[in-house]
C-alpha cells in the first residue's frame, strides 16, 4: 500500500502568511484552558480567589514548558549537541511530561509560599486539571505522529474498533504503529473521573495529588513499555524509572505525613 493512498491529517492547522500554526500547540493550549477552568471553578467553591489559578497558570505553564524541553534535550543530548539550533524548536513536539511536572511542582511550591496558601490545597485542586491537560495533550502527539508504539498491522488496529482517522494517522512511512497516545489518553481521562469522584470522599489534604501521581505513573509505566521513542539512560526507559519513583515517593509521603500529623486537615477544609 502506498503512503499516498492513506488519507492523513495535516499537522498544520492554519497558515498565517509565512507562519504555520500547528495542531500540537492548539491542542496543548486547549488542555491548559480547560484545566484552568476546572481548577478555577473548584477553587472558588473552596474559598480560593478566582485569580489565584489564573496567576499560577501564567507563571507555571511557561516554566513547565521550559523544564519539559530541558528534560527532553538532556536525554537526547547526542542529537542536540550536533544540532543546537533545534533546541528551541518545540513546534513539532519534544516536550517531556515528567520534566514539565517537575517545573510545575517547583513553581507551585514557591507560588503558594508567596501567596500564603497551602501548597497541598492548591495541588489537590489542580490534580484533576493537570491530568485532564495530559489526556488532551496526547492528541497533540497523535497529530504529530509521535509517541507511538511498535509496529502492528492494519487488521490489528481495525480489531480495536478504532475510527479510520486514528488508524490512518498511525500509518507512518509505510508502517502501522500502536496508538500508545490513545492508550495513555484514555487512561488519563479515566483518572480524571476517579479524581473528581474522590473529591467527595474528602481525603486528607495532599492525598488527592498523590493519588494523581500514582494513577498517572502506573498507566505511564505500562504504556511506555510499548513505545519506540522512549528517552533512555543506558538500558533503562527514563519514564518507567520516573514512574516507579513517583509511586514509591507518593506512598512514602502519604504514610509519613499521616504519622507526623501533617495530614490532619481534609480536602474540603478551609
Curated annotation (Swiss-Prot):
Q: In which pathway does it act?
A: Protein modification; lipoprotein biosynthesis (diacylglyceryl transfer)
> One biological-process term from Gene Ontology?
lipoprotein biosynthetic process
Describe the task this protein carries out: Catalyzes the transfer of the diacylglyceryl group from phosphatidylglycerol to the sulfhydryl group of the N-terminal cysteine of a prolipoprotein, the first step in the formation of mature lipoproteins.
Signal sequence, renumbered to the chain: none
Kindly indicate whether the keyword Membrane belongs to this entry: yes
Compartments where found:
Cell membrane
Its keywords, alphabetically, are: Cell membrane, Membrane, Transferase, Transmembrane, Transmembrane helix
One GO term describing the cellular component: plasma membrane
Query: Which principal EC class is assigned to this enzyme?
Result: transferase
Instruction: Provide the topology term for how it sits in the membrane.
Output: Multi-pass membrane protein
> Belongs to which family?
Belongs to the Lgt family.
Q: Which is an annotated GO molecular function term of this record?
A: phosphatidylglycerol-prolipoprotein diacylglyceryl transferase activity
Q: Does the keyword Transferase apply?
A: yes
Where is this protein chiefly located? membrane
Which intervals of the chain form a coiled coil? none
Q: Which residues bind a 1,2-diacyl-sn-glycero-3-phospho-(1'-sn-glycerol)?
A: 138
Which Pfam families does the record cross-reference, listed alphabetically? LGT
What's the Enzyme Commission number for this chain?
A: 2.5.1.145
User: In its UniProt entry, what is this protein called?
Assistant: Phosphatidylglycerol--prolipoprotein diacylglyceryl transferase
Query: InterPro entries recorded for this chain?
Result: Lgt
Give the species.
Answer: Bacillus cereus (strain B4264)
- Give the residue spans that cross the bilayer: 19-39, 56-76, 92-112, 116-136, 178-198, 206-226, 236-256
